[in-house]
Amino acid sequence: MEVRRRPPNPAVHVASLTYQVKVPGSSPSNILEEIVWYKEREVNAWREQLPLQQLQNQVRGLTQTPRDFLAALRQAPTRPAVIAEVKKASPSKGVLREDFDPVAIAQAYAANGAACISVLTDEKFFQGGFENLQRVRAAVDVPLLCKDFVIYPYQIYKARLLGADAVLLIAAILSDADLRYFLKIAHSLGLNALVEVHSLPELERVLALDDLRLVGINNRNLKTFVTDLAVTEHLAAQCRDRDLLLVSESGLFTGADLDRVTQAGAQAVLIGESLVKQPDPGLALQQLVGDRPSA
């Protein structure tokens, strides 16, 4: 694990007011660490509102089986298969789309070749939300990835309850033990897990996991937000003898970009910014994949 964790500051309740007690400690060293530290507080607040056991009971009461995210990627009619992202903003680029309608964007994706759809559920840094996940779930039939920064099992159960078919697990923010445990939880709930890496050490850790099926290679360094497609080329070469589906993520804008990562070994791509910034995201997706070869 490359990112430091920091438990939530203790709270003191006085009458109707709540104060966060300051504790000694340094500031986050990068944006990824800032996000993770915020998630510690966010999930802690969720657990106070709805304890984990109650959340688990609600999940057990679900009757609908999750859609098969991995199968949808494998069976996509084009290569690479596309996971199109519903994304309003990012810490590095700010607001990507002012007239943001998650349902309309998701429906446009589904109608124009997306094998799966990724929905940002982080509110503070990406202006997403679980409400968007629920609304998109009700509007489209393709499998959905809950895109967030998972650091506790609670988030996996919440994603399952609110309509996700897959969750993102980021190696840079999880220990080896947590990766194994979270992967097992996701699979036990019928969810696929896209396990994301950015470096060779992260990939080596992830390849040691049992029952690994999906690996996301993020071309963006989450500490600096710099993108480089050479990351996919370098890391995909280490996976050629593995029965895995590789997803290249970030920095993909043109057909030439898709060709490059496909030739490197990626069978799928996750694309967000280059689509949502266009006047018609569905048309942008169609133009990007419309002339792709059949799988």
Swiss-Prot record:
In which family does this protein belong, per the annotation?
Belongs to the TrpC family.
**UniProt cross-references to NCBIfam families, sorted A to Z:** PRK00278.1-4, PRK00278.2-4
**What span is annotated as the signal peptide, if there is one?**
none
- Which branch of life, at top level? Bacteria
Biological or metabolic pathway of the protein: Amino-acid biosynthesis; L-tryptophan biosynthesis; L-tryptophan from chorismate: step 4/5
What are its E.C. numbers? 4.1.1.48
Q: Which InterPro entries match?
A: Aldolase_TIM, Indole-3-glycerol_P_synth, Indole-3-glycerol_P_synth_dom, Indole-3-GlycerolPSynthase_CS, RibuloseP-bd_barrel
Q: Does the keyword Amino-acid biosynthesis apply?
A: yes
Q: What is this protein called?
A: Indole-3-glycerol phosphate synthase
Q: Which UniProt keywords apply?
A: Amino-acid biosynthesis, Aromatic amino acid biosynthesis, Decarboxylase, Lyase, Tryptophan biosynthesis
Name the lineage.
Answer: Bacteria, Bacillati, Cyanobacteriota, Cyanophyceae, Synechococcales
PROSITE patterns linked: IGPS
Q: Does the keyword Mitochondrion apply?
A: no
Single GO MF annotation: phosphoribosylanthranilate isomerase activity
Organism of this sequence? Synechococcus elongatus (strain ATCC 33912 / PCC 7942 / FACHB-805)
Q: Which reaction does it catalyse?
A: 1-(2-carboxyphenylamino)-1-deoxy-D-ribulose 5-phosphate + H(+) = (1S,2R)-1-C-(indol-3-yl)glycerol 3-phosphate + CO2 + H2O
Give one GO biological process term.
L-tryptophan biosynthetic process
